[in-house]
Amino acid sequence: MIDYKNTLNLPETGFPMRGDLAKREPDMLKNWYDKNLYQKVRESSKGKKSFILHDGPPYANGNIHIGHAVNKILKDIIMKSKTALGFDTPYVPGWDCHGLPIELKVEGIVGKPNEKISAAEFRQACRDYAKEQVEGQKADFIRMGILGDWDNPYLTMNFDTEAHIIRTLGKVIANGHLYKGSKPVHWCLDCGSSLAEAEVEYEDKVSPSIYVRFKAVDSVAVEAKFNAVGKGSGQISAVIWTTTPWTLPSNKAISINPEFDYQLVQFGGERVVLVKDLVESVQKAVGIESVEVLGEVKGDALELMQFQHPFYDYSVPLILGDHVTTDGGTGLVHTAPDHGQDDFVVSKKYNIEMAGLVANDGKFISSTPFFAGLGVFESNEKVLEKLKEVGALLKLERIKHSYPHCWRHKTPIIFRATPQWFIGMETQGLREQALGEIKSVRWIPSWGEARIDTMVANRPDWCISRQRTWGVPMTMFVHNETEELHPRTLEILESVAKRVEEKGIQAWWDLDPVEVLGEEDAKNYRKVPDTLDVWFDSGSTYASVVEARPEFNGNSTDMYLEGSDQHRGWFMSSLMLSTATNGKAPYKQVLTHGFVVDEKGRKMSKSLGNVIVPSEVWNKNGADILRLWVASTDYTGEIAVSHNILNSAGESYRRIRNTARFLLANLNGFDPKRDLVKPEEMIALDRWAVSCALEAQNDIKEAYDNYQFHTVVQRLMRFCSIEMGSFYLDIIKDRQYTTKADSLARRSCQTALWHIAEALVRWMAPILSFTADEIWSYLPQVEGRSEFVFTEEFYEGLFGLTEADKLDDAYWQQILKVRAESNRVLEQARKDKVIGSGLEAKVTLYANNEIRAMLEQLGNELRFVLITSQAIIKPLSEADVAEGEMAGLAVKVERAEGEKCPRCWHFATDIGTHTEHSSVCGRCVENVAGEGEKRSFA
């Protein structure tokens, strides 16, 4: 008896069913490194139009978290997809290496500078620590399959980068944007330094909430202003509200809004001045049963009226400020120019000087009456006691409210006026110019434009100086008496930059001023001791990296991509510096992603036990699962992750992998050079399948080009699961396995599968990089083929249907609907035990004229599309079963006629009619012993 199994073309491939990614990926990474994959990608793209995504530098401290993974994977998907779209995509990863967090870590190891260790040794310890942190993070980024110039990253502590940062400072000075002044800045008592806006977090804090009386210096004059002479009784006070009693010793004025209506009100046994709109709310807060309005006047009429400071022997004026609102309080704002930005600005208009009572350590200086030596927060209670003692405290409560905290120490900070260096927002029209540049940028998502526009419109001048040890120095000299910059500052900066380029920032601290100033000037000028804000470091990388490194060929940056918190961080600092130095934005597009939360929308937290550690994911599931999860998510909002969500990504991965494996297994023995069938000679269904792939590719390319990666994944899944998995790949199994190995019927099918596989692997590569690389190695080899899929552009061998194709896409879409209806009835027949599998069925399709004419075009091949042994078409009028879910069609299922063929498993009535092959059907006889069956459609 003949063993017909050997006559079948059974699928065969070495491509494993299981990904086993956690085990295989490291070997692939080694191969990529050994073969210098990144350089191969660069070489393959030489001469093409560039696309530059400038890497925002993560801070070189600690292990990477899931947010880092999202950020770097999104960047990698963009770079790989841009390569496939025909761009040259240099990618230089970077790290932010200076600043306080590293200082604090190093202090814990070696002690504070100039105590147990010299400042120079401390800086070297910081450099060594940062280098170690970079190496750890770098290994993790590489493990995720991120391609880049990992052997030559940019570090803000590289000597050449430090020198370029100094040169950027020089350009800021040259363009007239730098000034020195005493202004209130965010000040961390633990850091002993100012903080950037982006280094401030808001947390809940319990504070005293107090209403305070400032007695009128001249009650009669106040009565007269309110046209209320002789009205009411008791002392007259202006009432302010504050949650920072410690700032009252520095009070120099009370601000009111010139446009608001203010009232003199009888409050029990006293008279108070309040804004009209808040009288009722203050009455309730203070607990006064009844009030009487004695007079009313516009705020501007009260300008410069004098009121007595609650506990110091001086009076303070009422001054006018637009910052005063009726959102809360009393409409009269306690104004301490040392401790608030609005306070400072409005006081400056009236030439009101700052008090200067709080030292760097957050304690009141020794000359401060009543509070000398006390820390500011410690002094709150003492101030309250003093207010009670002098009868100035109208009301005291304790409230929980949002208060600024240091991002690193998590402790409350203060506003404090100190001599600092600033980039002026109004100087040389910087604010207006930056606002104009924002409009020239494409913001993704679009709401990013309004967000940064508001921030730039309202931000204060940028304090760029810090009082730290580990940072790029502000390499300037100021006159000992006048504090003016040296007249040769720009020349000196360049001279110092060259030294830093050779020896790093320590060259500045070791520099003898005589070397650059000469003997005489060295006596009259001193070094500025400050370092630059780390946001200046990273904000100037458009110059220190993109403009400076040769691989960027002088091209400007196309994209910045970071988390949405960077509107006030890196996007902002980069915009300010680039506009100040180059007169334009440093980027053409800015893409932001949301923060990672758990499946319930909660932040990642150890206490909640919902933290997903990236390394645990790739060690268990593989990095491709992490990459697929990132790509599957709409990154414009919050990005949800959990073990369940990752498991779901794993299921999607398996569907894609199974599709790829089916393609590879059925390309067994296929040599494109020898076996490829011309499009016009291919079977109709195969041509349609290739046209489906072309349509999918067009959708996928458009989605990649618009950074809509979740759309890419959805389209990829639809193609694998619906168009291929549940239709085309299902139908072709019979033809692929049972027809002659070298027949047109089979080679046509393999040609389609090969085109589809060549396209599919390229679609996957930006997202499922490891799996795409693995698939690439199993595809049939062709002459001149690249070693890696990552050097390839999207596949150009796909083709669409033409006018010559009678069975067009609309036709096959209708066939899909007929098949869905047939499957529905077959499934019911299976449940009713009429049949076991579809091949045990004979289906009769009762169709209206239109559907009948369509189905008849397939002739005897309709049964292959329906995957039944027999298929008969009859007029709908003859139906003895009801129409189903498709109008104009009724499907009847019966058991197939004849016997089951052991070779093809179809039921046939001609088994036993062939002498030599009596056990198989006539079709199989033709495929085994004859010229092979002919197929035209399916």
UniProtKB/Swiss-Prot annotation:
Gene Ontology molecular function: any one: tRNA binding
Locus of motif 'KMSKS' region: 603-607
Domain of life: Bacteria
Main subcellular location of this protein, as a coarse class: cytoplasm
Cofactor binding summary note: Binds 1 zinc ion per subunit.
Cofactor(s) listed in the protein's UniProt record: Zn(2+)
Localization of this protein: Cytoplasm
Residue positions binding L-isoleucyl-5'-AMP: E562
Chain residues that bind Zn(2+): C901, C904, C921, C924
Keyword set, alphabetical order: Aminoacyl-tRNA synthetase, ATP-binding, Cytoplasm, Ligase, Metal-binding, Nucleotide-binding, Protein biosynthesis, Zinc
Family: Belongs to the class-I aminoacyl-tRNA synthetase family. IleS type 1 subfamily.
Quaternary context: Monomer.
Name of protein: Isoleucine--tRNA ligase
Organism: Actinobacillus pleuropneumoniae serotype 7 (strain AP76)
Record lineage: Bacteria, Pseudomonadati, Pseudomonadota, Gammaproteobacteria, Pasteurellales
Gene: ileS
